[in-house]
Amino acid sequence: MNALVPLLVLTPLFGAALTLTAGRRRRMQIAIASLSMVVSLGVAVALLLAVQTTGQPLVMQVGGWAAPFGISLVVDRLSALMVVITSIVLLAVMVFSIGQGNVDHADEDTEEETPVSIFYPTYLVLAAGVYNAFIAGDLFNLYVGFEILLVASFVLITLGGTVTRIRAGVTYIIVSLVSSVLFLIAIAMIFAATGTVNMATISARVGVLPSEVQLVLHLMLLVGFAIKAALFPLSFWLPDSYPSAPAPVTAVFAGLLTKVGVYAILRTESLIFAANDISVLLMVVAIATMLVGIFGAVAQAGIRRMLSFTLISHIGYMIFGIALGTESGWSATVYYIMHHILVQATLFLVTGLIERVAGTSTITHLGGMLKRAPTVAVLFFIPMLNLGGIPPFSGFLGKVALFIAGAEGTGLAVPQWLVWVGIAAGAITSLLTLYALIRVWNLGFWRELDEVGDVESPLTIVLEEEPDADIVRDERNNSKLMNFATGGLVAVTVALTVFAGPLFTIADQAGENLRDSGAYIQTVTNEEGIKP
């Protein structure tokens, strides 16, 4: 079963190479890309089942090289869950993009947002980068995964070559390069101090370093990952970068790319620097991220920008769980990451559907969507309740699990009073998230079209143009394939609620593995034949 581990990365890379050879032959590119993602999903599910059955991580040493020069690929419960959820989102978004391309391709007057000769190869490279980051067993391979993401995401965010997208791409690439440089410097410092970049081996060796050295290394990694995860105050770039990209690209970015940063923080805090605690700093950052993000969201008139700010705010929930430093906190974080990847990606896809029906996603210019596009209304309503934390959806279950983990007060890495502040911030964030989303529903869906133009609030920030009144739009602007892909993701988000019991069991097991990383360290070091 270990032989399947590298297939997660190799399958999309091989698919990307084949799609390039297909040139502009649309159907061939679609067939190759779709097959690659289906195979990747199958491999991810097989790896999760294998890890669940054996209870032990799967390890592959690429090329047979031992540490510190070898490339370690490791799949434990946490990474297995991440790659399964990732595969579901990537496949659904690809189906959405195919449907969008089919509609645009059939209309000679419409320029495709996802040009076939560029989109599918780059999309598969992006998938390979995400997979590589989730299963990397050493810091340098994690860095390589980040760089693959950086190159592919820059191409995707600038598709179409508009001024807005180029400007967003420049902002994104500059910030990402700063993050990558900090990460690379941290890797060099860790290698100089420990003689390895393998995370399992670092975990065993870092404890003998002076506490000041450990703190510097810890903070260097944290800052690099915090930029990628969009933690306050390093989240300024996200609302200006993500909204400008095509809907499928934005959905993947919002659902997955920031979670790679969160995953790296969780892995760092649980494995590498478990004994060097900076949880108080993390908790303060989590609280600030939740509140600043959601206050930004309620001031937006554009749905894309509003969702970008809610994305930032809900990253705060995950950092809150990590900062608790307990098994229950980490377990709840794992479940919430799964929930947020799916729901956030779904909402951005629905926003893409709204734009194609109404010609805009600015709520001050929207109206009558419930009558014009009832399917889109349903597809928006369910994830709206989910992200807002309405019971019994997974958003509610995940938040409650995080709050209970903090309220337990057992073995916390932060003062109890600070945890209560975090819980209060989380409750406020949940209420304001629901307010922001209900505002979209009331103005965009419930309000009649002839009422559009009323000014709702002087605090509203409008950064989008009015729709072209000469274009007649309705639900036929969306293909059935686009609705099917979005509906599939909505169904999976509902499944997180229906099967919450078994999923929480797996999340609890993942949290237990994170708290007691001995099995991870032993499996990796034994596989390499090295001494910790």
Predicted regions and their residues:
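Transmembrane helix-loop-helix hairpins at membrane boundaries of multipass inner-membrane proteins
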Residues: N2-L4, L18-P121, A200-A204, Q509, ...
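N-terminal signal-anchor/start-transfer transmembrane helix
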Residues: L7-R26, V223, A230
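Alpha-helical transmembrane segments and their helix-start/interface "positive-inside/aromatic belt" motifs
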Residues: R27-V38, R167-L177, A373-L379, K480-G488
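C-terminal TM-helix exit segments that contain a strictly Trp-centered aromatic cap at the helix terminus
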Residues: G42-T54, L184-F191, I390-P391, L496, ...
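Peri-membrane helix termini and adjoining interfacial loops of integral membrane proteins
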Residues: Q52-W65, A192-S203, V357-A358, V400, ...
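Interfacial loop/helix-cap signal at membrane boundaries in integral membrane proteins
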Residues: P57-R77, G409, A413-W417, T523-E527, ...
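Hydrophobic transmembrane alpha-helices and their helix-loop junctions in integral membrane proteins
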Residues: A92-N102, A106, V125-F140, S153-S394, ...
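Cytoplasmic/organellar membrane-interface segments at the starts of transmembrane helices
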Residues: I363-T364, L370-A377, L437-P532
